[in-house]
Amino acid sequence: MKNQWFLLSLLATFLSFISCSKDDPFPTDEEDDMSFVHSVTVGDNAYVSLFKDLNVEQTSTQNSLVFAKESFLFTYGGNIYVLESMNARLYKYRVENGLLIQEKETMILPSGSLPAFLTFDSEEKAYISCVGLGKLYIINPTTMQKTGEIDLSEYAIGKESGDKNPEPGASVIRDGILYVGLAQDKSQFNPNTGAYVLLIDTKTDKPIKMISDNRATMATAYEYSGDPFIDEKGDLYIYCVGGFGYFANCTEGFLRIKKGETDFDQSYYFPIETISIPDIKGNKANYIYSKTYTGNGKLYGYFNVPGYVSNPRS
């Protein structure tokens, strides 16, 4: 297939994370030399901590901030934002003397809103995708105050039968337009077929149009997983997770919106499950979890490999 320029890499682990007792060996970084922040979920908690660089072989929960699981990290303007989805809270931190110091008050969103993604337009404006409400909240990330909201119920394809929530997920801004992936679920993890993306003018915060493509299903995956992303050419890529492999009629794959365009590129469709991947059982993966585009046509991701699935689960 044309233009399949992704280099697919199955990563067993990206970072080694262990929970250590106080007397375990643990790398001590210079306080003013922390360059990375990461989050790891263990049980019902998410542990957020800093470390120096990728030469660090292990980290510890000893100095971590603890949040509820399904908490997501975002960075902007030197600050770190933690979006706690299940508890519907947004926290803002700065790095000082090797520690995360909270700035401003915690922003509390409505119960059940399930905030899952944060996209920054400027120091005064950002968008939160509220999966549980079918809305985008507009906030000032500097003051941590809500400044508006965008109701997306009009774009729910199940609205005629009473479903007014299109489940907004991950998003990205390109050339003054916010591109928001919509899961369009019939029930949890059971999407309507097709990929749906809503385009919003960031100057007016008014929706422009919703575009769709029947080659893949479920644009983005409720929460941050490394897409949508924009490459060096300005082309925008969206991964459709296809119902996480549960439904045969819900196909996965990458779709593209080329620079200067606002519709899906009909010449491009890249499904992962059609690719033969060496050195894994069955040589096949059926969808991608988290992913990172690193430039020069290269993307790293965590793949779901059916050949390693056991019943009962191990």
How would you label these PLM feature ranges?
Residues 31-37, 79-80, 125-126, 177-180, ...:
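Entry beta-strands of beta-propeller and related beta-repeat scaffolds
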Residues 58-67, 101-110, 146-160, 207-215, ...:
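Beta-propeller fold detector
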Residues 41-44, 87-89, 132-135, 185-189, ...:
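Short glycine/acidic-enriched loop and turn motifs that connect beta-strands
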Residues 22-109, 115-121, 125-149:
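Acidic/polar, low-complexity intrinsically disordered N-terminal segments immediately downstream
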Residues 1-37:
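Bacterial Sec-dependent N-terminal signal peptides
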